[in-house]
Protein backbone atom coordinates (compact mmCIF):
# COMPACT_ATOMS: atom_id res chain seq x y z
CA UNK A 1 0.00 0.00 0.00
CA UNK A 2 1.30 3.43 -0.95
CA UNK A 3 1.80 6.05 1.72
CA UNK A 4 0.21 9.36 0.69
CA UNK A 5 2.52 12.34 1.16
CA UNK A 6 -0.12 13.76 3.54
CA UNK A 7 0.40 10.76 5.86
CA UNK A 8 4.17 11.09 5.56
CA UNK A 9 3.90 14.77 6.57
CA UNK A 10 1.93 13.86 9.71
CA UNK A 11 4.49 11.16 10.55
CA UNK A 12 7.40 13.59 10.04
CA UNK A 13 5.76 16.12 12.37
CA UNK A 14 5.23 13.40 15.01
CA UNK A 15 8.90 12.43 14.73
CA UNK A 16 10.09 16.04 15.02
CA UNK A 17 7.85 16.74 18.01
CA UNK A 18 9.16 13.61 19.72
CA UNK A 19 12.02 15.78 20.99
CA UNK A 20 9.51 17.38 23.37
CA UNK A 21 9.01 13.97 25.00
CA UNK A 22 12.77 13.56 25.38
CA UNK A 23 12.96 16.98 27.05
CA UNK A 24 10.09 16.11 29.42
CA UNK A 25 7.81 18.86 28.11
CA UNK A 26 5.06 16.40 27.09
CA UNK A 27 4.53 12.72 27.89
CA UNK A 28 3.73 11.55 24.35
CA UNK A 29 3.22 12.61 20.74
CA UNK A 30 0.69 10.52 18.79
CA UNK A 31 -0.81 10.73 15.33
CA UNK A 32 -4.59 10.87 15.23
CA UNK A 33 -7.51 12.82 16.65
CA UNK A 34 -8.50 10.65 19.59
CA UNK A 35 -6.74 10.82 22.91
CA UNK A 36 -4.64 7.65 23.00
CA UNK A 37 -4.17 7.59 26.75
CA UNK A 38 -5.83 8.52 30.03
CA UNK A 39 -6.03 12.22 30.74
CA UNK A 40 -3.91 11.62 33.85
CA UNK A 41 -0.92 11.14 31.53
CA UNK A 42 -1.24 14.65 30.07
CA UNK A 43 0.24 16.84 28.77
CA UNK A 44 0.53 15.18 25.38
CA UNK A 45 0.21 16.06 21.69
CA UNK A 46 -2.08 14.72 18.97
CA UNK A 47 -0.99 15.37 15.37
CA UNK A 48 -3.28 14.97 12.35
CA UNK A 49 -4.32 16.43 9.03
CA UNK A 50 -7.53 18.47 9.19
CA UNK A 51 -8.14 19.32 5.57
CA UNK A 52 -6.32 19.74 2.29
CA UNK A 53 -6.78 22.02 -0.67
CA UNK A 54 -5.38 21.19 -4.10
CA UNK A 55 -4.98 23.25 -7.26
CA UNK A 56 -3.56 22.50 -10.68
CA UNK A 57 -0.07 23.69 -11.46
CA UNK A 58 -0.51 22.38 -15.00
CA UNK A 59 -3.63 21.67 -17.01
CA UNK A 60 -4.69 18.24 -18.22
CA UNK A 61 -3.04 14.95 -18.96
CA UNK A 62 -1.70 12.14 -16.83
CA UNK A 63 1.20 14.28 -15.70
CA UNK A 64 -0.99 16.93 -14.08
CA UNK A 65 0.98 18.66 -11.35
CA UNK A 66 -0.83 19.59 -8.14
CA UNK A 67 -0.09 22.31 -5.63
CA UNK A 68 -1.41 21.09 -2.28
CA UNK A 69 -1.94 22.83 1.05
CA UNK A 70 -2.55 20.62 4.05
CA UNK A 71 -3.81 22.00 7.35
CA UNK A 72 -1.70 20.09 9.88
CA UNK A 73 -3.13 20.21 13.40
CA UNK A 74 -1.05 19.81 16.53
CA UNK A 75 -3.44 19.47 19.45
CA UNK A 76 -2.12 20.05 22.95
CA UNK A 77 -3.96 18.29 25.79
CA UNK A 78 -2.89 19.81 29.10
CA UNK A 79 -4.70 17.69 31.62
CA UNK A 80 -7.09 18.09 34.47
CA UNK A 81 -7.24 21.84 34.39
CA UNK A 82 -7.59 24.40 31.67
CA UNK A 83 -4.37 26.23 32.46
CA UNK A 84 -3.70 28.59 29.55
CA UNK A 85 -0.14 29.19 30.76
CA UNK A 86 0.76 25.52 30.32
CA UNK A 87 -0.90 25.38 26.90
CA UNK A 88 0.88 28.57 25.80
CA UNK A 89 4.26 27.31 27.00
CA UNK A 90 3.86 24.01 25.15
CA UNK A 91 2.56 25.87 22.07
CA UNK A 92 5.73 27.97 22.00
CA UNK A 93 7.83 24.79 22.10
CA UNK A 94 5.75 23.21 19.31
CA UNK A 95 6.13 26.32 17.15
CA UNK A 96 9.89 26.33 17.70
CA UNK A 97 10.30 22.65 16.77
CA UNK A 98 8.11 22.84 13.66
CA UNK A 99 9.69 26.11 12.45
CA UNK A 100 13.15 24.56 12.82
CA UNK A 101 12.51 22.40 9.71
CA UNK A 102 9.86 24.06 7.51
CA UNK A 103 10.21 21.34 4.86
CA UNK A 104 9.73 18.44 7.32
CA UNK A 105 12.74 16.64 5.98
CA UNK A 106 12.09 17.56 2.36
CA UNK A 107 8.45 16.50 2.17
CA UNK A 108 7.10 20.06 1.94
CA UNK A 109 7.97 23.23 0.08
CA UNK A 110 7.20 25.28 3.18
CA UNK A 111 4.98 25.47 6.23
CA UNK A 112 3.77 28.20 8.53
CA UNK A 113 1.56 28.66 11.57
CA UNK A 114 -1.84 29.70 10.23
CA UNK A 115 -3.93 29.70 13.42
CA UNK A 116 -4.27 28.73 17.06
CA UNK A 117 -7.38 27.81 19.03
CA UNK A 118 -7.26 27.70 22.82
CA UNK A 119 -10.11 25.88 24.49
CA UNK A 120 -11.23 23.83 27.45
CA UNK A 121 -13.87 21.16 27.61
CA UNK A 122 -15.35 18.87 30.20
CA UNK A 123 -15.08 15.11 30.10
CA UNK A 124 -17.31 14.00 32.92
CA UNK A 125 -16.43 16.10 35.93
CA UNK A 126 -12.92 16.86 34.69
CA UNK A 127 -12.11 20.04 32.78
CA UNK A 128 -9.43 19.52 30.17
CA UNK A 129 -7.30 22.27 28.70
CA UNK A 130 -6.63 22.10 24.97
CA UNK A 131 -4.95 24.20 22.35
CA UNK A 132 -4.82 23.42 18.64
CA UNK A 133 -2.10 24.89 16.47
CA UNK A 134 -2.80 24.72 12.75
CA UNK A 135 0.06 24.81 10.29
CA UNK A 136 -0.41 25.24 6.56
CA UNK A 137 1.92 22.83 4.78
CA UNK A 138 2.54 23.52 1.09
CA UNK A 139 3.74 20.68 -1.12
CA UNK A 140 3.58 19.41 -4.71
CA UNK A 141 2.80 16.03 -6.23
CA UNK A 142 1.79 14.62 -9.55
CA UNK A 143 -1.89 13.69 -9.75
CA UNK A 144 -0.78 10.18 -10.69
CA UNK A 145 1.79 9.94 -7.88
CA UNK A 146 0.32 11.20 -4.58
CA UNK A 147 2.93 9.14 -2.73
CA UNK A 148 5.95 10.97 -4.21
CA UNK A 149 6.69 14.28 -2.46
CA UNK A 150 8.10 17.56 -3.67
CA UNK A 151 9.17 16.68 -7.15
CA UNK A 152 11.35 19.34 -8.69
CA UNK A 153 9.43 19.35 -11.95
CA UNK A 154 12.19 21.18 -13.84
CA UNK A 155 14.73 18.45 -13.03
CA UNK A 156 12.40 15.47 -13.09
CA UNK A 157 13.08 14.83 -16.78
CA UNK A 158 16.50 13.50 -15.76
CA UNK A 159 15.23 11.41 -12.87
CA UNK A 160 13.52 8.11 -12.26
CA UNK A 161 10.20 9.97 -12.57
CA UNK A 162 10.78 11.01 -16.19
CA UNK A 163 8.52 8.21 -17.42
CA UNK A 164 5.50 9.70 -15.66
CA UNK A 165 6.15 13.20 -16.92
Q: Where do the protein language model's features map onto the residues?
A:
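Beta-strand-rich binding-surface signature
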Residues: 44
